[in-house]
Amino acid sequence: MVMVMIIGGALLMKDAPNQPARTGNNAGEGDYSLAESMRKPQYWMLALMFLTACMSGLYVIGVAKDIAQGMVRLDAATAANAVTVISIANLTGRLVLGILSDKMPRIRVITLGQVVSLVGMAALLFAPLNEMTFFAAIACVAFNFGGTITVYPSLVSDFFGLNNLAKNYGVIYLGFGIGSICGSIIASLFGGFYVTFCVIFALLIVSLAISTTIRQPRREAWEHARA
């Protein structure tokens, strides 16, 4: 099955259309080296948003069955369905947010995903949980996680250019590894899911505030040259 899917996908692939090269004074204006990017506050804002999405998604994915049995009191067989729900929501997030990223500003797509994840995390924290609300809540978190992973490379290129994307996104992608252990560390320090959910909820609020206010960096030298 996997081989058929890979071959089928490969047959559908096409080369991207050639883009005209930029010339003149504006050529390379939006391209930042890694060192230049890391001196911009926008870089660390994007890094924090990515870390938050990964931390929330990976933590919920890792402990979904435990949450179902410990907080919702579901039996083991029903709790195991969380894996299926997360997989479907993750894939849906990749498809939906990926398609939207070609039709609207990518930072707004990230904002949309954050709102969805915030709703899911709020449900886990504040709503009376039953089977339906639990599965809906973890689906919201997984939806944002999958969509963010898909959209973020292009979002980083929007802010810092394509020439050094591998380096610029590579450092931000460290948030995937860091986020994968942060939730577990917090849970082990404070014991249980509640404190971890509160931290993730707070980080989602901060990330949402960032995504609604962040602006692309501007090179001051070019600004003075144009004046």
Predicted features and spans:
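Intracellular juxtamembrane helix-capping segments at the cytosolic ends
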Residues: G147-F160
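Helix-to-loop junctions at the C-terminal end of transmembrane segments
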Residues: R94-P105, G191
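Extracytoplasmic gate region of multi-pass secondary transporters
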Residues: A35-I99
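Symmetry-related core transmembrane helices of the 12-TM Major Facilitator Superfamily/SLC fold
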Residues: M1-L11, V195-T213
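Flexible cytoplasmic inter-helical loops of multi-pass small-molecule transporters
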Residues: K14-Y32, E220-R226
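Structural signature of the two symmetry-related core transmembrane helices
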Residues: R108-A123
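Juxtamembrane helix-start elements in MFS-like secondary transporters
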Residues: L74-V83, N130, F134, L165, ...
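A late C-terminal transmembrane helix in Major Facilitator Superfamily
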Residues: F159-G192
